[in-house]
From Swiss-Prot:
It is an enzyme of class 1 (oxidoreductase). Its EC number is 1.14.99.63. The gene is crtW. Keywords: Carotenoid biosynthesis, Oxidoreductase. GO terms for molecular function: oxidoreductase activity. Pfam families: FA_desaturase. This is Beta-carotene ketolase. It catalyses: all-trans-beta-carotene + 2 AH2 + 2 O2 = echinenone + 2 A + 3 H2O; echinenone + 2 AH2 + 2 O2 = canthaxanthin + 2 A + 3 H2O. GO terms for biological process: carotenoid biosynthetic process. InterPro entries: FA_desaturase_dom (IPR005804).
Length: 242
């Protein structure tokens, strides 16, 4: 058994517990912010809630990403698809089918013109393409409908705008910078192999806070795509800083 392997039952149980914890925490902060939080009276709590939702929104996307690689519920593709679609809906109403097709293409053609996540331009143009790849007419129609429903339910409470779309937008920037642009930008450090991916030289706590280890261990992810995010640090051999 390799250093980063776990028995299938233990891997499944841990993945479900970790994923369930992230989803539950996101839902708790989401409900608290929209229905109970008085942001004007408790600005520090409101800021903490906002930052927490932003980070947990990154976590929702990472769960979907792991589900695409079959590592949330190993050996159960339908369960992975169900989990992936759930968290993508919570995150921004994204399509599971569209997302998984594009992401598998990214792994096959990482850092090339055939990579849907790659662009030769600067970070702003690259981010615009990155978002445009996944945010289409479906999402453009769905999100205003959801915001309208929230407006009808909550009345003049503006928190449904501040505490749902904005954390998702900031999370997308976080995902792009630490999980796409830094690992795959050309002309910075030489890539170690054909995956055209590098791992950022950051500590494990920073790696966790920025992109759930997909910044600090991005090259390792391309080497071991079925390893869940919380096991990525175990995939690096001692002394390896790639």
């Amino acid at each position: 058994m390799s250093a980063h392997a776990l028995p299938k039952a233990d891997l499944t149980a841990t993945s479900l517990i970790v994923s369930g914890g992230i989803i539950a925490a996101w839902l708790a902060l989401h409900v608290h912010a929209l229905w109970f939080l008085d942001a004007a009276a408790h600005p520090i709590l409101a800021i903490a809630n906002f930052l927490g939702l932003t980070w947990l929104s990154v976590g929702l996307f990472i769960i979907a990403h792991d589900a695409m690689h079959g590592s949330v519920v190993p050996g159960r593709p339908r369960a992975n698809a169900a989990m992936g679609q759930l968290v993508l809906w919570l995150y921004a109403g994204f399509s599971w089918r569209k997302m998984i097709v594009k992401h598998m293409a990214h792994h096959r053609h990482a850092g090339t013109d055939d990579d849907p996540d790659f662009d030769h331009g600067g970070p702003v143009r690259w981010y615009a393409r990155f978002i445009g790849t996944y945010f289409g007419w479906r999402e453009g129609l769905l999100l205003p409908v959801i915001v309208t429903v929230y407006a009808l339910i909550l009345g003049d409470r503006w928190m449904y705008v501040v505490f749902w779309p904005l954390p998702s937008i900031l999370a997308s920037i976080q995902l792009f910078v630490f999980g796409t642009w830094l690992p795959h930008r050309p002309g910075h450090d030489a890539f170690p192999d054909r995956h055209n991916a590098r791992s950022s030289r950051i500590s494990d706590p920073v790696s966790l806070l920025t992109c759930f280890h997909f910044g600090g261990y991005h090259h390792e992810h391309h080497l071991h795509p079925t390893v869940p995010w919380w096991r990525l640090p175990s995939t690096r051999t001692k002394g390896d800083t790639a």
